[in-house]
Amino acid sequence: MTSLADLPVDVSPRHEGERIRSGDMYVELAGPKSFGAELFKVVDPDEIEPDKVEVIGPDIDEMEEGGRYPFAIYVKAAGEELEEDVEGVLERRIHEFCNYVEGFMHLNQRDQIWCRVSKNVTEKGFRLEHLGIALRELYKEEFGNVIDSVEVTIMTDEEKVEEFLEYARRVYKKRDERAKGLSEEDVNEFYVCLMCQSFAPTHVCVITPDRPSLCGSITWHDAKAAYKIDPEGPIFPIEKGECLDPEAGEYEGVNEAVKEHSQGTVERVYLHSCLEYPHTSCGCFQAVVFYIPEVDGFGIVDREYPGETPIGLPFSTMAGEASGGEQQPGFVGVSYGYMESDKFLQYDGGWERVVWMPKALKERMKHAIPDELYDKIATEEDATTVEELREFLEKVEHPVVERWAEEEEEEEEKAPEEEAPAEEPTMEVKELPIAPGGGLNVKIVLKNAKIYAEKVIIKRADREDKS
């Protein structure tokens, strides 16, 4: 087979956004219950076998229905105009091109990919070789001006995928290191990526030198290179405009661009805040920052952590809160690269407000966490509930504890007013997300609220007496 027309399935942008539920799935590739990676490398012409597509390991017809398998995609390309700087952004197009393929779902990026193949296309004869052919032809079609030859290797053999995963992570690290050095103050242009609007139509990903894409795949340098080779593509520059608030990371040009490309849904963004006008998310983010009102601090959980956080919610539930292209104060999707930024959540207090992380994530980000704070951030080994978290923070004298004292002093100063007969106990909230645990599918957001109550009781309707 040498062309898209020869494939047993349709390949078209109209399949973007297709979700394959577990009941419709034939097999799952990589994902949270297995492992995998994807990589795009620019190589010399003599390092590539033009047009070669190879599958190493079992193909779809050799897999058991309902099974989960390791999975890797390796695309190598050569061309006189190709430069190493474009690898990251061309790699991100693997996500887009895979989703062009009927019956194939691709989520996330890098070493967090999660793919599914539907029963329907399996019955049509779809194989992983066909996916490789589709990727090869789409790269040649979309980037024929800079790509002379392409080779695609797809792996499902467990040992080969493990080896490839280690290699890919070394490449990712090298790319990320290359991206450091610039800050938002040093440039006049930021970049916008709309690649994920097929899944989240109002999500606009703003990429600055201090804030890589949420998926972690595209830095400011990557975006600049992407626009150079594909000026009509989903990544393009915007004028950052006047800086309205340097701490919050609010820029006139960003607000204008986000409003235009979100169809007016989002009008204002603080690039460096979780609590006020947070950046929107699509669902491909590497981690979620979430506010814990009981301790006035933030937790961070990534998709590698399978357990529940102290607020009773796992990553999967919070990912639903933060995604979809909507602003959800108290929840924001982030990349590992942004956690390394000097501007990480600086409007909200930065690392001094972070109180909980999974142990593995905390160790991964050790180089980014200030030394004096590292041992003061709890993990699942220190706290699994809000009560345990509060005790831990008091014990280690975390900086947020000082905030509690300040809040208590403010409350004491207001006490005489509250003792007046005409007044009941008052809670004033500018904006506070409350995400209840216990599997209760409810979210309450209080905006600019003043509440007078001795007690608040929330019940599920199906549990109330119907007599």
UniProtKB/Swiss-Prot annotation:
Cofactor(s) listed: [Ni-Fe-S] cluster
Acidic residues compositional bias, start-end: 405-426
UniProt region (Disordered), positions on chain: 403-428
Cofactor binding mode and count: Binds 1 [Ni-Fe-S] cluster.
Enzyme class, UniProt record, top EC level: transferase
Classification via Pfam families: ACS_CODH_B_C (PF19436), CdhC (PF03598)
Cited NCBIfam families: cdhC, PRK04456.1
Subunit and partners: Monomer. The ACDS complex is made up of alpha, epsilon, beta, gamma and delta chains with a probable stoichiometry of (alpha(2)epsilon(2))(4)-beta(8)-(gamma(1)delta(1))(8).
Record's function text: Part of a complex that catalyzes the reversible cleavage of acetyl-CoA, allowing autotrophic growth from CO(2). The alpha-epsilon complex generates CO from CO(2), while the beta subunit (this protein) combines the CO with CoA and a methyl group to form acetyl-CoA. The methyl group, which is incorporated into acetyl-CoA, is transferred to the beta subunit by a corrinoid iron-sulfur protein (the gamma-delta complex).
Name of the protein in its database record: Acetyl-CoA decarbonylase/synthase complex subunit beta
Provenance organism: Methanopyrus kandleri (strain AV19 / DSM 6324 / JCM 9639 / NBRC 100938)
Upper taxonomic lineage: Archaea, Methanobacteriati, Methanobacteriota, Methanomada group, Methanopyri
